[in-house]
Regions:
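Catalytic core of nucleotide-sugar-dependent glycosyltransferases
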Residues: 202-211, 217-245, 265-282
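Nucleotide-sugar donor-binding/catalytic module of glycosyltransferases
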Residues: 1-225
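Membrane-interface aromatic/basic loop that binds lipid-linked glycans or pyrophosphate carriers
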Residues: 267-314
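Active-site activation/catalytic loop segments of kinase-like enzymes and analogous catalytic loops
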Residues: 122, 260-267
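Short, surface-exposed helix-loop/turn micro-motifs enriched in polar/charged residues
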Residues: 178-179, 199, 243-251
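Hydrophobic alpha-helical core bundles mediating ligand binding, dimerization, or RNAP-core interactions
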Residues: 184-187, 231, 255-258
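Amphipathic alpha-helical repeat scaffolds of TPR domains
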Residues: 249-261
């Protein structure tokens, strides 16, 4: 039976990208797909572009700007599918993406399907390169979180996942108080209400990088507070399910990475993170950075090296 899959897309000021994203959704080979786009108060002409797609079977809903999470929840609330894929308005899916993920799930309603991904830059797919990760395999769901967070470099982008409606009914929708890295908290919660992650080789997400003004690039106080709360809540979901040393260590590494990322700014949030890490057993995570940063930190320590890096902008 060809069960219905709902693609739920929030769209805010994505006029440059939403057409190709929807084209990739419309090109899916799975025969029973509905596409729901919520135009979240766009002011750049996205609404006019979306109007052209309504005649091609895309359901478009317009609302005043309420944020990405509210738009995703609205799209989900309007959906009817047995399986749900949340999809950003600036990325691309390979044509067999949903067909392959549905084959992996094979009717299961207690597991989620994951996928391959890679980045491309400057609207040029010739720059695309897969980014293999250790979690590209079938795994128990909470073990996926432990492994993905172990180096604090997890990729939890929404389009990677095909989620049974029954899982979402247990986990709940997107947290509308969050903006930056909202997917961290959401998918931690989804995983904690799933039994297994089934990896889907060949299902490829083309992740667009380098977009000026993108949500992931925001560094305002409000955005950083969102990242802080998303990390605290997301790690809390995992630790409520299991508190073994491996889980605690991975959570500590995620908190430590937040400190590395935002130091020396937002000192109050960094201090709060620092107080939580010892209770998780500590972190031995090394800060990320270019070769010059690592060479410098060996002599002056990571904090001084980060300040110098910020001062000179590289």
């Amino acid at each position: 039976m060809n069960q219905l899959v709902s693609i739920c897309m929030p769209c805010y000021n994505a006029a440059r990208y939403v057409g190709p994203a929807l084209d990739s959704a419309l090109a899916q080979t799975w025969p029973n797909v509905e596409i729901i786009v919520v135009n979240d108060g766009s002011t750049d002409g996205s609404g006019e572009i979306l109007a052209d797609y309504e005649g091609r079977g895309v359901k478009v809903i317009h609302q005043a700007n309420r944020g990405q999470c509210a738009a995703a929840n609205r799209a989900y609330g309007e959906s009817s599918g047995d399986y749900i894929k949340f999809f950003d308005a600036d990325d691309l899916l390979s044509p067999d993406f949903i067909t392959q993920q549905m084959a992996r799930l094979d009717g299961r309603t207690d597991a989620v399907a994951s996928a391959e991904w890679g980045r491309f830059h400057d609207d040029n797919l010739a720059t695309f390169k897969l980014n293999p990760q250790s979690v590209w395999r079938d795994m128990e769901a909470t073990e996926w979180l432990v492994e993905a967070w172990s180096d604090a470099r997890s990729m939890m982008q929404c389009a990677l996942w095909l989620i049974p409606r029954q899982v979402l009914e247990r986990s709940g929708g997107w947290d509308e108080s969050l903006s930056l890295i909202n997917d961290f908290e959401f998918f931690a919660r989804v995983m904690c209400h799933s039994e297994e992650v089934l990896f889907t080789p060949g299902a490829t997400l083309y992740y667009r990088s380098g977009i000026t003004g993108s949500l992931s690039g925001q560094k305002s106080r409000k955005a950083v507070e969102s990242a802080y709360h998303s990390i605290c809540r997301g790690t809390g979901h995992l630790l409520a399910r299991r508190d073994d040393p491996a889980a605690k260590r991975s959570c500590a590494n995620v908190l430590q990475d937040f400190i590395y990322t935002y130091y020396p700014d937002h000192s109050d949030l960094l201090a709060k993170m620092e107080t939580r890490i010892p209770g998780m057993g500590g972190s031995e995570l090394v800060p990320g950075g270019p070769p010059k940063f690592h060479a410098l930190r060996r002599f002056v320590g990571w904090k001084a090296a980060r300040r110098i890096q910020r001062l000179f902008g590289h």
